[in-house]
Amino acid sequence: MNNVLIITGPTASGKSKISIKIAQDNNGVIINCDSKQIYKEIPIITDQPKLNETFIPHKLYGYVSAVKQYSVAEWVNDLKREIYQTFAENKLPIITGGSGMYISSIIYGLSQIPVIDDNIRYQTKQLFNTLGNKEFYSLLIEKDPMAKRLHCNNSYQLLRAYEVIEQTGTSIFRLQEELKRKPLFDNFILCILVPQKQEVYKKINDRFISMINSSVIEEVKNLISLNIPNHFPAMKAHGIPEIIQYLTNKISIEKAIEIAQRNTRHYAKRQYTWFKNQFPNALFYESQDQLLKFISKKFK
């Protein structure tokens, strides 16, 4: 039976590096499951692999325009196409990235929640813009107490939960429990890389400085020139809001760096908790060496 290998973990945990090593040793193809690395206009700030520096096949990187609101369902369709093509070539698909919604769609399947009316989607967004995160979160909790499990700063999930309760009258979490879902693939192996937090935090800080020292400012300038609405997914990539604040003379570059580093560290911290809670049966590895040893035994 063909295996599907999934390598995930917090941002800056070394997923990309170890995936390349695994692909080299096992005739693999790396397939992206990072929801921001899909966008072709922002390769630097999303730390996309430099495909001209490796002979390992990489799929689903930098192939969607930032002007598009690309859905999880669309990604799943693209993923399945790449997986089956990889099987046809007798290669090992290595799904790599840290986007929780993408990983969940593989492990638990896509939600069968009804499509939201455009009018409800628009009204929800307008309400969110008027109230702001905290007041909108409080209103959501009144309508859907089960939404307390959401983080008040995760605007995407707050909007989604509100849209669903408005559309269906039922909590998104209740619907997820009641509507039958199944994994995309029965033969997946889920490995989660969880290095020491301080090691990851240092990499986050260093990586952002490296981006600033490259041409990331110019990259964000070009993104701004596209006049993309702020709520579009690409505009929320880590570091972009802070650099935009700098470019609009609201904060200094030093402050932009400080805030972006802090926000990304906080995101990584939440990822540690989220992965452990969502995927308790996954294989967790603190070091790349531990993971490589497992892979070498599994596929020898």
Curated annotation (Swiss-Prot):
Q: Which GO terms describe its biological process?
A: tRNA modification
> A Pfam family in this protein?
IPPT
Keywords, A to Z, come to: ATP-binding, Magnesium, Nucleotide-binding, Transferase, tRNA processing
Which molecular function terms from Gene Ontology are attached? Answer: ATP binding; tRNA dimethylallyltransferase activity
Q: Which residues bind ATP?
A: 9-16
* Cofactor(s) the protein requires to work: Mg(2+)
Question: Could you tell me the superkingdom of the organism this chain comes from?
Answer: Bacteria
Q: Where is this region: Interaction with substrate tRNA?
A: 34-37
Q: Where are the residues marked Interaction with substrate tRNA as a site?
A: 99, 121
The catalytic activity, as recorded, is:
adenosine(37) in tRNA + dimethylallyl diphosphate = N(6)-dimethylallyladenosine(37) in tRNA + diphosphate
Specify which residues bind substrate according to the UniProt entry for this protein: 11-16
Q: What Enzyme Commission number(s) does the record list for this chain?
A: 2.5.1.75
Q: Which cysteines are joined by disulfide bonds?
A: none
The record, for InterPro entries, names: Dimethylallyltransferase, IPT, P-loop_NTPase
Which purpose does this protein serve, as stated in its record?
Catalyzes the transfer of a dimethylallyl group onto the adenine at position 37 in tRNAs that read codons beginning with uridine, leading to the formation of N6-(dimethylallyl)adenosine (i(6)A).
Q: How does it assemble?
A: Monomer.
- Which family, according to UniProt? Belongs to the IPP transferase family.
NCBIfam families, per the entry: miaA
Tell me what this protein is called.
tRNA dimethylallyltransferase
